[in-house]
Amino acid sequence: MSYAKVKNAYTIAKGEKLCCVISLGYGKTHGTPHKSKLPEEVAVIKDDTPEWFINGVNAALLAPTAMNQQSFGFMLDGDKVLAKAGKGILSDMDLGIVKYHFEIGSGKEFFKDEMKFA
């Protein structure tokens, strides 16, 4: 059932707007798998790239993105991870979700100071 079909499923206060809806749970069917990009298509990976970075990239590739576009990129710069949104619809919002998945997969925090809450 869609959130739009359920009366009072959500509340939007004055001055707020609904940016996106992320569904959680299990569907009636398993759906269909979508093609995913390869880690090398979204990150700079070399022979000496640490395993935690590769794990983070692989987790980021599992993150939900608008229209399954996976429009983002990661790069390791010394001890810092750089993440960039690509072009596409909602790619800036997708980047926040992707960064979270990267941190879960890598087991390390990199983007905590970048997160801002209104």
Where is each model-derived feature located?
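Acidic, surface-exposed loops and disordered segments
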Residues: M1-A118
